[in-house]
């Protein structure tokens, strides 16, 4: 049986795309996934260009595969994702043993690219942007668990000054409304209970409705997804504050399946820096959206992104970021030191802040966020949380683990329940009382009223 090894870098969109690569190759050639590159007939790197030195990391990985390729001449080596879009044919020029190079929008063409490579003996490169075509050529999703990702759109048209995504994934293109609903319904029929809707900027979704000229916005899509039988939770990522509309905020009042957790990247707490980043909103506008949302959902947890050390960032600018963190009380963040991306406007900005200062700022920011996380977790002790049971606990396979609405892992034991019954709980919703908070997880006990029903 032929096998494919896929190494994924970056965001959840890439995780989704990697799953689709696997699905495409399974449908076309019967390839099955493997975690061991030495056992693979096809090795793919799904790359991310958001962070610094992304290209170097790719070529470092390719260097390690070169020796394997020498031992297995028929091994197919491919590079996909955003670095592939950015570098294109130059990847093959630098590493001639790479067989296929493809972008996020052309992953559905993988079988054809591999076949062309075998037929012609020449490396194949396709990093074009055929809009939403790829979704029309993907096989039905294969379910692994009670949670699944569903991509609703591709690309981004915001052109923040530091971001390479519009250049690597293209402009915003929304999937047709009916196509998204059909995919979610198909997943629900296979036992999926929680869907995460994906896009570089899901708020910008504007999907074509059937054969009409009407378009559905993101709030309407959420409303219809919630009506699909079997779907009990809805998450989404990533959203842009500029388009966090009043209709979307109102959806939290009318749609109980929307979880009490939101990832809303702010990037900075200084209006001056936000303007330089070309984010399109002020700190006050951002805080206003959070205030309106919390008026509807007081317990909603907010996650975010921060860029530290953007060119021109002063101590006063950074202090404003810290003020915002204290005011909002963020529950986790993805925070990084700014790194210039080639071809973006911000790469030309003068940057005179010492690296040591940037590192100290990042350390301070992350420590503060960790304090928030610990405080919020501790505040959950004694509460009853509804969790989606995901599977056996990683540390103790005789226990189970699940996830709360605010995205925390809860481990719990059911010592009086036979293993067969424990396994039957995977994919189900359970009420669990939180009894202890750890730095990165919670400990729970199944609520007594649910324990009785679980035992039968």
Swiss-Prot record:
Does this UniProt record's set of keywords contain Cytoplasm? yes
GO CC: one term? cytosol
Residues binding [4Fe-4S] cluster 1 are 11, 48, 82
Which positions form S-S bridges? none
Locate the residues binding [4Fe-4S] cluster 2: 156, 160, 163
What does the UniProt keyword field contain?
Answer: 4Fe-4S, Cytoplasm, Iron, Iron-sulfur, Metal-binding, S-adenosyl-L-methionine, Transferase, tRNA processing
Keyword S-adenosyl-L-methionine in annotation: yes
CDD domains hit by this protein: Radical_SAM
Compartment(s) where it occurs, according to its Swiss-Prot or TrEMBL record? Cytoplasm
Cofactor mode of binding and number, as noted:
Binds 2 [4Fe-4S] clusters. One cluster is coordinated with 3 cysteines and an exchangeable S-adenosyl-L-methionine.
Q: Which residues form the Radical SAM core domain?
A: 142-375
Residues covered by the TRAM domain: 378-448
Record Pfam families: Radical_SAM, TRAM, UPF0004
Q: Which domain of life is it from?
A: Bacteria
The main enzyme category here is transferase
The UniProt record lists the MTTase N-terminal domain at 2-119
Name its co-factor(s).
[4Fe-4S] cluster
Q: Which PROSITE patterns match?
A: MTTASE_N, MTTASE_RADICAL, RADICAL_SAM, TRAM
Annotated GO molecular function terms are:
4 iron, 4 sulfur cluster binding; metal ion binding; N6-isopentenyladenosine methylthiotransferase activity
Q: Where is the signal peptide?
A: none
Family classification: Belongs to the methylthiotransferase family. MiaB subfamily.
State the function annotated in the UniProt record.
Catalyzes the methylthiolation of N6-(dimethylallyl)adenosine (i(6)A), leading to the formation of 2-methylthio-N6-(dimethylallyl)adenosine (ms(2)i(6)A) at position 37 in tRNAs that read codons beginning with uridine.
The record's section on PANTHER family has: CDK5 REGULATORY SUBUNIT-ASSOCIATED PROTEIN 1 (PTHR43020), MITOCHONDRIAL TRNA METHYLTHIOTRANSFERASE CDK5RAP1 (PTHR43020:SF2)
Q: How does it assemble?
A: Monomer.
Q: What is this protein called?
A: tRNA-2-methylthio-N(6)-dimethylallyladenosine synthase
């Amino acid at each position: 049986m032929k096998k494919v090894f896929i190494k994924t870098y970056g965001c959840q969109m890439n995780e989704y795309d990697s799953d689709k690569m696997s699905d495409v190759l399974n449908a076309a050639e019967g390839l099955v996934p493997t975690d061991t590159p030495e056992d693979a007939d096809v090795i793919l790197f799904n790359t991310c260009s958001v962070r610094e030195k992304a290209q170097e990391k790719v070529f470092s990985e390719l260097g390690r595969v070169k020796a394997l390729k020498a031992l297995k001449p028929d091994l197919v080596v491919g590079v996909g994702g955003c670095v592939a879009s950015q570098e294109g044919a130059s990847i093959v020029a630098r590493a001639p043993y790479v067989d296929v190079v493809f972008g996020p929008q052309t992953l559905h063409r993988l079988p054809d690219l591999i076949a062309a490579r075998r037929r012609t003996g020449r490396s194949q490169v396709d990093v074009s942007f055929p809009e939403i075509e790829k979704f029309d050529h993907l096989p039905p999703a294969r379910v692994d668990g009670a949670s699944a990702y569903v991509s609703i759109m591709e690309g981004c048209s915001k052109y923040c000054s530091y971001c390479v995504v519009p250049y690597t994934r293209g402009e915003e293109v929304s999937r047709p409304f009916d196509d998204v609903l059909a995919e979610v319904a198909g997943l629900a029929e296979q036992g999926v209970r929680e869907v995460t809707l994906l896009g570089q900027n899901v708020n910008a979704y504007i999907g074509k409705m059937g054969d009409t000229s009407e378009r559905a916005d993101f709030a309407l899509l959420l409303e219809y997804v919630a009506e699909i039988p079997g779907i009990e939770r809805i998450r989404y990522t990533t959203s842009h504050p500029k388009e966090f509309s009043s209709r979307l905020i109102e959806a939290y009042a009318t749609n109980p399946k929307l979880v009490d957790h939101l990832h809303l990247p702010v990037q900075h707490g200084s209006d001056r820096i936000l303007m330089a980043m070309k984010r399109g909103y002020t700190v006050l506008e951002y805080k206003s959206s959070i205030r309106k949302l919390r008026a509807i959902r007081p317990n909603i947890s907010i996650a975010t992104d921060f860029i530290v050390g953007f060119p021109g960032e002063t101590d006063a600018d950074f202090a404003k970021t810290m003020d915002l963190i204290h005011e909002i009380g963020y529950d986790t963040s993805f925070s990084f030191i700014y790194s210039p991306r080639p071809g973006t406007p911000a790469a030309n900005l003068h940057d005179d802040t010492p690296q040591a200062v940037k590192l100290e700022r990042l350390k301070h920011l992350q420590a503060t966020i960790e304090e928030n996380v610990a405080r919020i977790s501790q505040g959950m002790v004694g509460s009853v949380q509804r969790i989606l049971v995901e599977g056996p606990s990683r540390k103790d396979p005789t226990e189970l683990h699940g996830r709360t609405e605010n995205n925390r892992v809860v481990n719990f034991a059911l010592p009086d329940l036979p293993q067969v019954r424990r396994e039957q709980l995977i994919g189900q919703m359970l009420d669990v009382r939180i009894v202890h908070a750890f730095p990165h997880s919670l400990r729970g006990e199944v609520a007594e009223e649910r324990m009785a029903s679980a035992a039968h």
